Amino acid sequence: TYPEIWLQERFLDLHNVFLSFEGSMYISICLGLIDNTTGVLYYVNAEHPWTVLYRDGKASFLEQELSLRKIGTPDQEDQLYIRIFNLMPGDVIITGSDGRDDLVLRNQDGVEFIQEDEQQFLMRVEEGDGKLSRIAQRVKETGALMDDFSLLRISFDESLTETELPKEIPDQV
């Protein structure tokens, strides 16, 4: 089985379970597979906080737009497509809950407000050098957590060099 087909089937399995709840329950999800040989990342993001790529000291989002609603949302099966991204040696993928963005801050007058700017998390990733414990520390130093806070870090072979990767990697499926 091709990884993108397996991923699509598993997504639809989960989606059908949540459809059976008839609107009483939805979940956001980021689900993916990495080919350990080529570094190809196959993934789908259903209204989950955007996936971060940390490469060469810079953090950026893999997604640029919302393309899929939460699992359990009716009539989106035809909108499902598997995203493909080519990881390079040393690349780090970071994903996590929306608690990473929703922080309680104080303005100059001491008035509390909620920071919801997703771009701020990219700064915390860079300040933390892509290391989870440092990122978490920087997030907590920036503001008070108001929601659940979880992070997941996946790195592609940090010991490989680019010349050891296969030359042909698909752009999309």
PLM regions with names:
Residues T1-D56, L66, L80, K140-M146, ...:
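Catalytic core of PPM/PP2C metal-dependent serine/threonine phosphatase domains
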Residues T1-Y2, L87, D91-G143, L160-P170:
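Active-site-proximal, acidic helix/loop segment immediately C-terminal to a metal-coordinating Asp/Glu
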Residues D13-L14, H48, I71, E118-M123:
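Histidine- and acidic-residue-rich, metal-dependent catalytic cores
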Residues I27-I29, Q64-R106, A144-L145:
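Acidic loop->beta-strand submotif enriched in PP2C/PPM serine/threonine phosphatases
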Residues R153-L160:
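Short beta-strand-to-coil "C-cap" segments at the C-terminal boundary of structured domains/repeats
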